[in-house]
Amino acid sequence: IGADTTEISVISLGGIVVSRIIKLGGNRLDQMICDVVKRKYNILIGLKTAEQIKKTLSDAMYDEDNEEEGDDILYVYGRNVITGLPSERGVSKDTIYEAIKQFFDDITDSIKNLLERTPPELSADIIDTGIFLTGGSSSIKNLDKLIAKETDLKVNTVENAEDSVIRGISIIMSDSRYRKLMYEPRESSF
């Protein structure tokens, strides 16, 4: 789950079997948070503040009955849309969850659709290996649990998920054992 897109792929024997890229990413979540804070609290916030809210309050399986007291409010600063003056407001976790729930539904639906298009011969490998989540927004609380619940598959998360793609590219480029995974566009003769 990258900044602007989410890539869902089934990989086997070092190659992509089926793949889908959807235009949903962390930046879209940030914008959804900006929009709901403006709509519900009459406060304009910037994308950095929205990202802070995302990292602190976002939960793919939010259950307000199971939350500790005080964990469900984050105080943020912005500009009041009515007065135009700086303002502080407590943003609730349940408001953020309701605003971004559709994002997670779209991701899980896309994963299930891709798995339905996957050759049945790969089912054993998929069940054994599971799903791997990478990218900055893949570390949102309970996203792995939601995907596991929706797909009935094991979901693996990676350490430092936001840097995993660039670290992988670095390994592919620097280690000759992985050269076959590198894509090099052919020069055109224009």
Predicted regions and their residues:
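Gly/Thr-rich phosphate-binding beta-strand-loop-beta motif of the actin/hexokinase/Hsp70
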Residues: 1-16, 141
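Phosphate-binding glycine-rich/basic clefts of nucleotide- and phosphate-handling proteins
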Residues: 11-101
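Short, surface-exposed connector motifs at secondary-structure boundaries
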Residues: 13-17, 124-129, 151-154
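Residue-level signature of catalytic and energy-coupling elements of molecular machines
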Residues: 33, 111, 133, 169
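Active-site phosphate-binding and catalytic loops of NTP-dependent enzymes
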Residues: 43-47, 63, 116-123, 179-183
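Glycine-rich phosphate-binding loops at beta-strand->alpha-helix junctions
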Residues: 62, 123-147
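Phosphate/ATP-binding catalytic cores across multiple sugar-kinase/actin-like superfamilies
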Residues: 99-126, 172-175
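Glycine-rich phosphate-binding/hydrolytic loop that grips phosphoryl groups
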Residues: 145, 156-190
